[in-house]
């Protein structure tokens, strides 16, 4: 086919190009330059990485401000929106200010895909994605976390709660824009 096309002219490689020596030297030069580049890895077990507020780690339940229990009102939205169905809730009524709270609240961490849908849909900001990323289990039973393992104080997830408030304010339209649309 090359002989029939008059525009095609095969390029002749010289001796060094046929040996691929220049290309090998270019690769070695790049490798040598990388020896003196700054190190960007951390020595993990000794040095822990501090994730930013945007990071979605293990989901946790947030305590109420008065530390009398969880913020959760057992509405069940998080369990309905969870794609892998990792969350299970059973509600019971209480005599406290809120009418209901979860009698059982479990998250199967083997099923959780850390999507954050449960956090987005929660009306009480009761379930939040924490900054915990080093999650290990000895057996499958330990991977199912109940209320006692999930409950954390507000101070521990305050950075994430502040991020969520800022994020939700950016997503929602200000009231002035909504009133202008109605006119």
UniProtKB/Swiss-Prot annotation:
Q: Tell me how this protein sits in the membrane.
A: Peripheral membrane protein
Domain 4Fe-4S ferredoxin-type intervals: 63-92, 103-132
Where it sits in the cell: the answer is: Cell inner membrane
Quote a single Gene Ontology cellular component term. Answer: plasma membrane
| A UniProt-annotated Pfam family | Fer4_7
EC assignment: 7.1.1.-
**Superkingdom of origin organism:** Bacteria
Q: Where is the signal peptide?
A: none
Q: Where are the transmembrane segments?
A: none
State where [4Fe-4S] cluster 1 binds.
72, 75, 78, 122
Q: What is its main location?
A: membrane
Quote the cofactor binding remark.
Binds 2 [4Fe-4S] clusters per subunit.
Q: Cell membrane: is it a keyword of this entry?
A: yes
What InterPro entries does this protein's entry cite?
4Fe4S_Fe-S-bd, 4Fe4S_Fe_S_CS, NADH_quinone_OxRdtase_chainI
Q: By its UniProt entry, which Gene3D superfamilies does this protein fall under?
A: 3.30.70.3270
Q: Does the keyword Repeat apply?
A: yes
List the cofactors. [4Fe-4S] cluster
Q: Name one GO molecular function term.
A: NADH:ubiquinone reductase (non-electrogenic) activity
Which GO BP terms apply?
Answer: aerobic respiration
List, alphabetically, the NCBIfam families matched: NuoI
Name the protein family: Belongs to the complex I 23 kDa subunit family.
Per UniProt, subunit arrangement is: NDH-1 is composed of 14 different subunits. Subunits NuoA, H, J, K, L, M, N constitute the membrane sector of the complex.
Q: What is the recorded name of this protein?
A: NADH-quinone oxidoreductase subunit I
User: What is this organism's lineage?
Assistant: Bacteria, Pseudomonadati, Chlorobiota, Chlorobiia, Chlorobiales
Whichever gene encodes this chain, its name is: nuoI
């Amino acid at each position: 086919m090359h002989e029939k096309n008059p525009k095609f002219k095969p390029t002749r490689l010289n001796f060094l190009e046929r040996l691929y020596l220049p290309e090998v030297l270019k690769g070695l030069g790049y490798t040598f330059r990388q020896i003196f580049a700054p190190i960007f890895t951390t020595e993990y077990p000794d040095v822990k990485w501090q994730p930013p507020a945007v990071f979605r780690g293990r989901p946790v339940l947030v305590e109420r401000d008065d530390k009398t229990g969880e913020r959760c009102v057992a509405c069940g939205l998080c369990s309905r929106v969870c794609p892998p169905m990792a969350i299970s809730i059973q509600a019971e009524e209480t005599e406290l200010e809120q009418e209901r709270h979860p009698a059982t609240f479990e998250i199967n961490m083997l099923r959780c895909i850390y999507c954050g849908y449960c956090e987005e849909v929660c009306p009480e900001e009761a379930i939040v994605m924490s900054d915990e990323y080093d999650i290990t289990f000895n057996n499958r039973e330990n991977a199912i976390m109940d209320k006692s393992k999930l409950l954390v104080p507000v101070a521990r997830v305050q950075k994430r709660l502040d991020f969520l408030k800022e994020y939700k304010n950016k997503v929602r339209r200000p009231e002035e824009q909504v009133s202008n649309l109605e006119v």
